[in-house]
């Protein structure tokens, strides 16, 4: 929806549509014209991977034991060559691990510099998480920056590698939005 100020036509907000029009406190939201709508496209994973290369932080969303959604920032630790699978290190005793053990369906949110109508990109990923406790796998995804968080490196007691395999990905970049072919 495009929300315009009465009698001026100035756009004051852009939001998800809720119907043909909504009025509140003198503002009227109307469905956008064809020129104001997002451009729906499909991109390949390689297209999106290039744009995601500089994004280190993702928001990992899990299902809690009471049915709520829990979110936390997770670092890619320099392992950002996106191929549909993401890896994150954490500790065994975290809520994220408990949530994934109960329900492996997760979501990831990525955002680069920029605003909604600038050159930044936003990517939402839905997928299935797997908990890996194998030291050989740790070594494949380990970077020296992780030593700041895990004092004994891959030998730190209680570390877990979270692997998220994407089943669906959506992106927004300026006026362009769409699904990613996985």
Region locations from a protein language model:
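Cationic, low-complexity basic patches in intrinsically disordered or flexible, solvent-exposed regions
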Residues: 6, 24
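Short, Lys/Arg-enriched N-terminal segments with co-localized hydrophobic residues
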Residues: 25-39
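A short, Trp-centered hydrophobic/proline-enriched beta-strand micro-motif
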Residues: 50-66, 106-110
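A short mixed-secondary-structure module that forms the rim of ligand-binding clefts
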Residues: 77-116
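Charged, gly/pro-rich active-site loop segments
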Residues: 37-39, 121-182
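A generic structural signal for short beta-strands and their flanking turns/coil linkers
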Residues: 56, 70-72, 82-84, 102-106, ...
């Amino acid at each position: 929806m495009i929300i315009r100020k009465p009698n001026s036509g100035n756009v004051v907000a852009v939001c998800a549509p809720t119907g043909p029009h909504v009025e509140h406190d003198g503002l009227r939201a109307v469905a956008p014209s064809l020129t104001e709508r997002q451009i729906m496209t499909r991109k390949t994973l390689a297209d999106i991977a290039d744009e995601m290369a500089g994004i280190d932080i993702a928001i990992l969303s899990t299902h809690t034991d009471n049915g709520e959604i829990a979110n936390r920032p997770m670092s890619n630790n320099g392992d950002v060559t996106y191929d549909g699978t993401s890896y994150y290190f954490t500790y065994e005793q975290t809520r994220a691990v408990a949530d994934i053990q109960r329900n492996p369906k997760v979501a990831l949110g990525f955002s680069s510099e920029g605003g909604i109508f600038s050159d930044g990109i936003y990517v939402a990923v839905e997928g299935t998480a797997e908990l890996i406790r194998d030291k050989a796998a740790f070594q494949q995804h380990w970077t020296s920056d992780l030593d700041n968080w895990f004092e004994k490196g891959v030998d730190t007691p209680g570390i877990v590698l979270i692997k998220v395999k994407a089943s669906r990905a959506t992106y927004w970049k300026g006026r362009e939005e769409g699904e990613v072919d996985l």
